[in-house]
Amino acid sequence: MKTKVKKKSAILTIIFTFIVLIGVKSISTAEEPFTGKVYLQGTNKGVLLFIQKNYRTQKDNKTIMKHVYTTPEGKMAAEEKVVYVNDTLDSYTVDMAYGNCGCVLHREGQKVTFGFTRGDSSKNGTADYTNDIVMGPTLNDYVKLKWKRITNGEKVYFMLPAMSLQRLAKFYLEKNPQSPYARPGVMVVKMNISNLIFRAFVEPVDLVYDLETKRIVEIHGKSLLQRKVGNKIENPVVDIYYEYGR
């Protein structure tokens, strides 16, 4: 029973990342610069938790893509980083300020290796590499790549690194016209885990895209981000709103 609870808890911590955090073979259509404001859900933008910014740097054959989260006061909260070498996924890292938690994924040929640390404990593992590995900094490129299929109502499947389990978890994207965030001019894309057992414990995340520009404009759901509430660390449910250009 304890093993099942641990696995359920681990899946719960990876559903968002985004926030959720894509190892797409081509990265020629990188995200436009944006600023995301991360609010505690249910406060009508009354409680600002984090500021999100994206960055992309290119040097010789190496491309680095980042999502950086800071507190409203400017303190580092979390960073996701994807590195490509010769347009091929090389590594993915996540560093969290609270909880002394970090993750790293490296590609080694047709395998990926995982490293996960929390406090004084660490875990390592390997899995087979696939072309549809999804991570936060390139998620929006992946949605654009599959845009026609999603708008036509198809489910699009991909693999998301579940670092604490040292495995790749299967997720899907699907148009969600019944979402409370659906309205004229946007398409809501639901992201959910494929496994039926875990789906009973995990709430899906709604990604809101502008139909004309294909830009992501909102995200609503459980966050991988951590905040300290009293003596406890929690993963809040959030509303993220994006603005473009800096």
Regions found by a protein language model. Name each.
Residues K2-I14:
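Bacterial N-terminal signal peptides that target proteins for export
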Residues K7, V24-S26, R227:
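Intrinsically disordered, low-complexity segments
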Residues T13-G23:
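Bacterial N-terminal signal peptides
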Residues L21-E32:
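Bacterial Sec-dependent signal peptides at the C-terminal "C-region" and cleavage site
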Residues V24, D87, K148, I219:
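Residue-level marker of positions within ordered structural domains that often coincide
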Residues E31-I64, V68-N86, Y92-G99, V104-G109, ...:
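Acidic, serine/threonine-rich low-complexity disordered tracts
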Residues G115-V186:
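Solvent-exposed helix/loop surface patches that form functional interfaces
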